[in-house]
Amino acid sequence: MAMPLCSLTSYNPITTTLRGHHFLTINAYVKTQCIPCFFIKLHTRSSGSKQRIIDLRSGSSNIVACVGEGATSLSSHSDIMKTAKREEIPPGVWKDDISDSIMSSHKPEADEKRVEILIAEIKSMFRGMGDGETTPSAYDTAWVAKIPALDGSDHPHFPQTLQWILQNQLQDGSWGEGTYFSTYDRLLATLACIITLTVWRTGQTQVRQGIEFFRKHAGTMEDEADNHQPIGFEFVFPAMINEAKSLCLDLPYDTPFIKQIIEKREAKLKMIPTDTLYTVPTTFLYYLEGLQEIIDCQKIIKLQSKDGSFLSSPASTAAVFMCTGNTKCLEFLNFVLIKFGNHVPCQYPLDLFERLWAVDIVERLGIDRHFKKEIKDALDYVYSHWDERGIRWARENPVAYIDVMATGIRILRLHRYNVSSDILKTFRDENGEFYRFPGQSERGVTDMLNLNRCSHVAFPGETVMEEAKLCTERYLWNALENVNPLDKWGLKENIRGEVEYALKYPWLRRLPRLETRNYIEHYGANDVWLGKMMHMMPYINDRKYLELAKLDFNNVQSIHQKELRELRRWWKSSGFAELNFLPDRVAEIFFSIASSMFEPELATCRAVYTKSTLCTVILDGFYDVHGSAEDIMLFNEAVKRWDHSLLDRMAEHIKTCFLALYNVVNEIAEEGRKRQGHDVLPYIRNLWEIQLESFTKEAEWSRAEHVPSFHEYIEAAAISSALPTLVLIGVIFTGEVLTDHILSQIDYRSKFAYLMSLTGRLANDTKTYQVERGQGEVASAIQCYMKENPELSEEEALEYIYRLMENALADFKCEFLNTKDVPEYCRRLVFDNARSMQLIYMEGDGFKLSHETEIKQHVKKILFEPVA
């Protein structure tokens, strides 16, 4: 019978068989007077137990009882079988002179002053965030300008707005957003302005030019995509056409499109549920100026926002004020004009929207480390306005918008704020489909893309997030079938590229520098937002962000190139390159750490991680393929002694492996002593002994052609994956003094580290088991599971392993989001190790076969190719 998934994703302290009769148990938690320890018990079935405690702080290594003499020998096969298992080494990807060729002419020091200026300017933007910066709306300004003077005189109450209209007509005779031409936007704004000028009997020249523009372009509206229609266009445009008729303006009223939109409005007006129109805030509040003949203005006042507006819309608020004289409406309009002077935007405030999007931009562009305080201040502000209804685009806004809600949930969760996803249920219909606003049936590419991103930070059991993931994936794949996928609330030049990237590389396959490089290529500094009118938001779309991101990326890449050149020199001097165990994969392995732990101050962490990984890969090949049983026993003994006393008994390839490991570990330990303030050599040696014992066990399985139980294999994989070893060495160099509490959350005692190892091993197995089986490897997750479930086909077993991995990844993600009191770099090292494995084994063995997978292109983009 197939094992239930839940039985393997639950966490237990790790117990695995190592070196024949010995068992390794990693205790779930050990505390000895708050001194950080790495606590390991070695048991035998015969003569009691032995116990070794490695104290990271003191560096002492106390053997409570000796490990025992004479480990059981490994089963030996013939040298012929050993040779048969050796795989043909894939070709190297990078040329021998790569060290010189990768060194770009980029000089980071030349950019330092400009970088400092940009950082200061962006910090100033964050500090200056109030209720939101946005561009003028000619349409809304025209509505405000229509308000007559309160003293009854024949003048506008806000004469400055009328002057703005007279002074801001575009050269073609239209009004509207000048940076992007949309027929809908221009005609709606132009119609509003010529009506207002006609009402006040001024600007005859501007009116004539506006009418000429309108007549010229009215017939082309039917050619523009429906997705470019402003929100509420089908209500406000026909209403204004009727007003233009009453003013005897010479417009082409018989144009087919105008007739169609009027008919469409009449049909929609009949469908409006008048019983709920005055009881529940809806998007109708956003365009009340287009519904004046059907609404009771006195009743609608009940849905007025606390700030006096109707859904933050100056036009809608102005229309209600002219109908009711409500003083709160006037207070809101005065408030907006105090901010903007002689014009108004299409909606205001936008305080929550602006802060969330600014944080999202600097994070996705990879420059967030320069703005830690600003980000925290912005998110504290956003979270202070989170309630049981979630958040809106503005603090007083009564209508929920899924784009803001989804983005808020994702960003706040990633920053450890406690927010619930239950609010997303209000956007879901009975068929499990999600829409932009509750109870409505419109949605756009950006809405669904941000909801999809949100769904990836789900906790186990959050059904609504899983439903959102499935719904958005369907929608986005369908959107890609269009030649030019269009968005409803934004005109983005690179929306297709963003969607393709998000679908191909979900969050758990996405490394920070790849995300940065991709977003630099897709960020639109000139993107236009589409609400009731087109508008731009300068604190969200600003070329300063992009300029800093490019400079920063190239500066960091230049640092990484220098590090890679030194690592390649070390690789050649170590003797590893001559062993023919592995092709030159220094760049790929360095990429796996540099694409996540990329900050300049983590240079030592990257070097240590890369060297340790190369040692691990080489030794895995030695134990697995290139070493005899006797070779392995000799090597293990040499590592235990940690001296040169056995070198004379070693073959050259064994000697090379040992000396390289010996020198690397001693070098790392010396640097670690400086960082941690005490001797860490016993700690690091102990990690390697554990690692090599796991390699020994797997070699024993292979030589005996033994397929272990699935449970035994999975438990052993927690160590044999080598990920804990690499993380626990690398974490020494993240700038933190390691306490027992920190270690307990990321070492073998933690579920976090266990799931990192498990998911990494399963990702590896699913893409390598067939090749390794052909080389004589008999133990993999797939084969072990099939042994216990012989009724299953290989495809069914593989499908089970994929499901197991997905469940484990969900738990792992939860651990990452919930891990408390662990420094950011430590958490990231664990989390991004797991993500790196998911990416590298996405198509195949991305380390060994990088020349055949996309990994080569990723390496080039992150390490070799600067952004232009």
Curated annotation (Swiss-Prot):
InterPro entries: Isoprenoid_synthase_dom_sf (IPR008949), Terpene_cyclase-like_1_C (IPR034741), Terpene_cyclase_plant_C1 (IPR044814), Terpene_synth_N (IPR001906), Terpene_synth_N_sf (IPR036965), Terpene_synthase-like (IPR050148), Terpene_synthase_metal-bd (IPR005630), Terpenoid_cyclase/PrenylTrfase (IPR008930)
Record's catalysed reaction(s): (+)-copalyl diphosphate = (-)-pimara-8(14),15-diene + diphosphate
GO BP, sorted A to Z: defense response; diterpenoid biosynthetic process
Pathway where this protein functions: Terpene metabolism; oleoresin biosynthesis
Record text on cofactor binding: Binds 3 Mg(2+) ions per subunit.
Keywords: Lyase, Magnesium, Metal-binding, Plant defense
Record: residues binding Mg(2+) 2: 620, 624
Domain of life assignment: Eukaryota
Keyword Magnesium assigned: yes
Binding site for Mg(2+) 1: 620, 624
GO molecular function, one term: magnesium ion binding
Cysteine-cysteine disulfides: none
Role, per record: Involved in defensive oleoresin formation in conifers in response to insect attack or other injury. Involved in diterpene (C20) olefins biosynthesis. Monofunctional enzyme lacking the DXDD motif in the class II active site relevant for the cyclization of geranylgeranyl diphosphate (GGPP). Requires (+)-copalyl diphosphate ((+)-CPP) as substrate, but no activity with GGPP or ent-CPP. Pimaradiene is the major products of the enzyme.
Miscellaneous information on this protein: The Asp-Asp-Xaa-Xaa-Asp/Glu (DDXXD/E) motif important for the catalytic activity in the class I active site is degenetated, but the Mg(2+) binding sites are conserved.
Family to which the UniProt record says this protein belongs: Belongs to the terpene synthase family. Tpsd subfamily.
UniProt name for this protein: Monofunctional pimaradiene synthase
Species per Swiss-Prot/TrEMBL record: Pinus contorta (Shore pine)
